[in-house]
UniProtKB/Swiss-Prot annotation:
Enzyme Commission number(s): 1.5.1.5, 3.5.4.9
UniProt superkingdom: Bacteria
Self-association state and partner proteins as the record states: Homodimer.
Chain coiled-coil ranges: none
Cellular component, GO annotation: cytosol
Catalysed conversion reaction: (6R)-5,10-methylene-5,6,7,8-tetrahydrofolate + NADP(+) = (6R)-5,10-methenyltetrahydrofolate + NADPH; (6R)-5,10-methenyltetrahydrofolate + H2O = (6R)-10-formyltetrahydrofolate + H(+)
Keyword Hydrolase: yes
Function summary: Catalyzes the oxidation of 5,10-methylenetetrahydrofolate to 5,10-methenyltetrahydrofolate and then the hydrolysis of 5,10-methenyltetrahydrofolate to 10-formyltetrahydrofolate.
Involved pathway(s): One-carbon metabolism; tetrahydrofolate interconversion
Species of the source: Rhodobacter capsulatus (strain ATCC BAA-309 / NBRC 16581 / SB1003)
GO biological process: L-histidine biosynthetic process; methionine biosynthetic process; purine nucleotide biosynthetic process; tetrahydrofolate interconversion
Protein name: Bifunctional protein FolD
InterPro entries: Aminoacid_DH-like_N_sf, NAD(P)-bd_dom_sf, THF_DH/CycHdrlase, THF_DH/CycHdrlase_cat_dom, THF_DH/CycHdrlase_NAD-bd_dom
Length: 300
């Protein structure tokens, strides 16, 4: 297991606490002129897997000073019923932001529900409008995991303008947004995927390698330039020979740390910062709702 005292390890929990402290201070200042609403977490049907994420989000919200409400809708709820409930939350001025927990039941079209969340309450950055805005360098309400990956790059102290970055993985919610976020900051980004002829050819020249594929230990030390930063977004459940389930990233951390200048552990790396980005998006949402005049009635 990675030793977080190693200077090469970027401790996501420490980054999270630093971010949340700053967010709390800014929210307290914002609340002096306009009341800050609550975050509403929506789960469709019970799920032990979701409960872990909800607890982490609730804990971070408490640290940031944000009211947090968890609601669980029936697993049998129809698509239209869910959209009506989301519309009601959109219209409720006491609701700052809406979080749609995943996975959802098979009969629910998750993208349709994400599209139903008003962009100014889309604290996850998952509404198509929010993702599309990134193309125009409006990066303040970005998908949380993508924003967290960029924040981890910042934690290295490497200047983003001109930085050579290789993004391995091109999903709609991580890989592609990461590429656009970094390009908005002036980085030179190469995106690799399953049809890339030689991922290693690209990764070995990169100052930063970011990985989000979902394949345990895909990246070894032979694929990394000495001194490069390695940001591991992958989360994989692997059963070892003793029958014990372990959480592994897409990077062989123990081997790669001997080559890398910086590396994120799994767990405890990008994950905690993703939750902090959710709270930062909530702060941004509040400011934009104030600017749009949504909160004037609540202020009065």
């Amino acid at each position: 297991m990675a030793d977080r005292r190693d200077h090469r390890i970027i401790d996501g929990k420490a980054v999270q606490q630093r971010l949340l402290a700053g967010i709390r201070a800014e929210l307290e200042a914002a609340a002096e002129t306009h009341p800050v609403g609550r975050l509403v977490s929506i789960s469709i049907g019970p799920s032990p897997e979701i409960e872990v994420y909800v607890r982490n989000q609730a804990r971070a919200a408490a640290t940031a000073g944000l009211p947090f409400e968890q609601v669980v809708w029936e697993a049998s709820a129809t698509q239209e019923a869910c959209k009506r409930k989301i519309a009601a939350l959109n219209d409720d001025p006491s609701v700052l932001g809406i979080i749609l927990q995943r996975p959802v039941p098979a009969h629910i079209h998750v993208r349709s529900l994400q599209s139903a969340i008003h962009p100014l309450k889309d604290v996850e950055g998952m509404n198509p409008a929010s993702i599309g805005n990134i193309v125009y360098n409006d990066i303040a309400l970005a998908p949380c995991t993508a924003a967290a990956a960029v924040e981890m790059v910042r934690a290295t102290g490497l200047p983003l303008p001109g930085l050579e970055v290789v993004m391995i993985g091109h999903s709609e919610i991580v890989g592609k947004p990461v590429a656009f976020l970094l390009m908005a900051e002036g980085a030179t980004v190469t995106v690799c995927h399953h049809m890339t002829r030689s991922v290693a050819m690209h990764s070995r020249r990169a100052d930063v390698v970011i990985v989000a594929v979902g394949k345990a230990h895909l990246i070894g030390p032979e694929m990394i330039k000495p001194g490069a930063a390695v940001i591991d977004i992958g989360i994989n459940q692997v059963t070892d020979a003793a029958g014990k389930v372990r959480i592994l990233g897409d990077v062989d951390t123990e081997a790669v740390r001997e080559v890398a200048g910086w590396i994120t552990p799994v767990p405890g790396g990008v994950g905690p910062v993703t939750v902090a980005m959710l709270m930062r998006n909530a702060l941004t949402a509040h400011r934009r709702q104030v600017a749009a005049g949504w909160l004037e009635a609540a202020k009065a």
